């Protein structure tokens, strides 16, 4: 491989790029930027591709700029949207920018000498731009005809909801960002998802018209799933990078449950593994799909990258719990995550105090056994587990010492029938 573009090509990440970009990257190291929309107080897995694109460029010796959209976030990007989004307050956008800065920073190296990463906020220049200056210095150079030809605008023009002047002007603001970064930071390249191509080329045109210079664009494909459903969404919503919003366990499980048809592509997109390593994992998936070797590697790589080694270890321990693994090191929060969807029964705390609650009675109260004799037979037959430890003692009494953080006891009948006892 001679340039970063060669790596992006074999990973399937080069959707479209400006003419001459190959030659530029062959002869010089460049500064590039990608913008991040602060529409929430956390990034989600849909942001991993842009984050990793910046990181990949930096590993090739280029200088990445992560641009938080504190200014453009006040307007809202119409690209890929079928209707206008509600405007966030200035205070909310500013708070979101501060919240995502740390997530942006963890993927980039800010102490890499002459190609150290930069973290900027376009509110620093957009909020100082007067209306008159904007109309004279930006609006003058891009015709309405030019803007209407862009997919992000044209698709909205033909919809019932249309497009407001506010969102229509977003393209000009993003173009101004590119021109500003070109002039003040020597930024020659903007990257983004394929739905950003129109906005990126508008910036290239503005730079050509106002500065008489050549700039470049590059877009990667939008992430898709083989079954046609939206990537990054689960039944409970988006998969966030913030562990308070999506726990490391659920984050790990998202990647572990990726379909066989998608896992090879996602290994290329979201990890640093080599082509040889990925091809070997694909061969294993083709011959022994039940092992889920590729999915496990994907889950490990991405969880480690986002949450760190300690969180990965806890996520893997938690993942084993549903397959009979030890619960000894799990917290109450882990239990809620893992057993959220299993049947549960709340029993009074006082019943577990003193000598404790007879296991036979607990099984009856939870509906795991239909009668005391049924409970006794199941226990004696080795079919009952307390916190995944087999319990063949019919005289066993459960106490608070059996509970996890004083809140939960996990019962299991046979191999798969779980029941969560909540200590009330």
Curated annotation (Swiss-Prot):
Motif 'KMSKS' region positions after renumbering to this chain: 230-234
Enzyme Commission number, as recorded: 6.1.1.1
Pfam families xrefs: SYY_C-terminal, tRNA-synt_1b
GO molecular-function terms, A-Z: ATP binding; RNA binding; tyrosine-tRNA ligase activity
Motif range ('HIGH' region): 38-47
Catalytic activity from the UniProt record: tRNA(Tyr) + L-tyrosine + ATP = L-tyrosyl-tRNA(Tyr) + AMP + diphosphate + H(+)
A GO cellular-component term linked to this record: cytosol
Keywords: Aminoacyl-tRNA synthetase, ATP-binding, Cytoplasm, Ligase, Nucleotide-binding, Protein biosynthesis, RNA-binding
InterPro entries in alphabetical order: aa-tRNA-synth_I_CS (IPR001412), aa-tRNA-synth_Ic (IPR002305), Rossmann-like_a/b/a_fold (IPR014729), S4_RNA-bd (IPR002942), S4_RNA-bd_sf (IPR036986), SYY-like_C (IPR054608), Tyr-tRNA-ligase (IPR002307), Tyr-tRNA-ligase_bac-type (IPR024088)
UniProt-annotated binding residues for ATP: 233
GO biological process, one term: tyrosyl-tRNA aminoacylation
Cell compartment(s), UniProt: Cytoplasm
Domain S4 RNA-binding: 357-424
Family designation: Belongs to the class-I aminoacyl-tRNA synthetase family. TyrS type 1 subfamily.
Alphabetical list of PANTHER family matching this protein: TYROSINE--TRNA LIGASE, MITOCHONDRIAL (PTHR11766:SF0), TYROSYL-TRNA SYNTHETASE (PTHR11766)
Job description of the protein: Catalyzes the attachment of tyrosine to tRNA(Tyr) in a two-step reaction: tyrosine is first activated by ATP to form Tyr-AMP and then transferred to the acceptor end of tRNA(Tyr).
Subunit comment: Homodimer.
Protein name per the record: Tyrosine--tRNA ligase
Gene that this sequence comes from: tyrS
């Amino acid at each position: 491989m001679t340039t970063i573009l060669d790596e992006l090509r074999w990973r399937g990440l080069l959707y479209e790029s400006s003419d001459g970009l190959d030659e530029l990257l062959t002869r010089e190291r460049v500064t590039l930027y990608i913008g991040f929309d602060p529409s929430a107080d956390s990034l989600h897995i849909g942001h991993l591709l842009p984050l990793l694109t910046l990181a990949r460029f930096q590993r090739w010796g280029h200088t990445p700029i992560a641009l938080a959209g504190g200014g453009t976030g006040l307007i809202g990007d119409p690209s890929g949207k079928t209707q206008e989004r509600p405007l966030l307050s200035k205070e909310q956008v500013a708070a979101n920018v501060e919240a995502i800065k740390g997530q942006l920073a963890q993927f980039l190296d800010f102490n890499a000498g002459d190609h150290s990463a930069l973290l900027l906020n376009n509110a620093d220049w957009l909020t100082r731009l007067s209306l008159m200056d904007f109309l004279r210095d930006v609006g003058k150079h891009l015709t309405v005809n030019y803007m209407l030809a862009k997919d992000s605008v044209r698709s909205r023009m033909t919809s019932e909801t249309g497009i407001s002047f506010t969102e229509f002007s977003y393209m000009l603001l993003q173009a101004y960002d590119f021109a500003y970064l070109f002039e003040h930071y020597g930024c020659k390249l903007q990257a983004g998802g394929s739905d950003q191509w129109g906005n990126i080329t508008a910036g290239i045109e503005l730079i050509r018209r106002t500065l008489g210079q050549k700039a470049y664009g590059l877009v990667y494909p939008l992430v898709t799933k083989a079954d046609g459903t939206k990537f990054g969404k689960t039944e409970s919503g988006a998969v966030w990078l913030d562990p308070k919003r999506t726990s490391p366990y659920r984050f790990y499980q998202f990647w572990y449950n990726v379909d066989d048809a998608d896992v090879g592509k996602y290994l290329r997109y979201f990890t640093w593994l080599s082509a040889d390593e990925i091809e070997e994992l694909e061969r294993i998936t083709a011959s022994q799909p039940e092992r889920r070797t590729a999915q496990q590697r994907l889950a490990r790589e991405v969880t480690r990258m986002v949450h760190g080694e300690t969180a990965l270890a806890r996520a893997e321990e938690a993942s084993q719990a549903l397959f009979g693994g030890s619960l000894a090191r799990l917290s109450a929060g882990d239990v809620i995550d893992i057993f959220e969807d299993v049947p549960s029964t709340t029993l009074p705390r006082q019943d577990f105090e003193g000598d404790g609650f007879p296991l036979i009675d607990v099984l009856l109260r939870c509906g795991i056994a239909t009668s005391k004799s049924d409970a006794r037979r199941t226990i004696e037959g080795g079919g009952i587990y307390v916190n995944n430890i087999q319990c063949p003692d019919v005289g066993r009494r459960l106490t608070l010492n059996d509970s996890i953080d004083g809140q939960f006891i996990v019962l299991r009948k046979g191999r798969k029938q779980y029941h969560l006892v909540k200590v009330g």
